[in-house]
Amino acid sequence: MKQGIHPDYRETTVVCTCGNTFTTRSTSQSGTLNADVCSKCHPFYTGKQKILDAGGRVARFERRYGKKN
């Protein structure tokens, strides 16, 4: 690798909106990153995931032409 062209790779604190914080490494200049979701509050990881059927294109097709079994 060429010397002097790569940004510094330093420890960075990631702060989630739920209040969870953890340390990782990044090239961020500020030393902190703000995240909207993390593994502590994301529905997929917490098991609180809801499956919503909004009646999309597939449901509309099935209503129109009948669902074939």
From Swiss-Prot:
Residues bound to Zn(2+): 16, 18, 38, 41
Cofactor(s), by name: Zn(2+)
Keyword Cytoplasm set for record: no
Cofactor comment text: Binds 1 zinc ion per subunit.
Record text on subunit structure and interactions: Part of the 50S ribosomal subunit.
Functional summary from the UniProt entry: Binds the 23S rRNA.
Name of the molecule in the record: Large ribosomal subunit protein bL31
Organism of origin: Cutibacterium acnes (strain DSM 16379 / KPA171202)
Phylogenetic placement of the source organism: Bacteria, Bacillati, Actinomycetota, Actinomycetes, Propionibacteriales
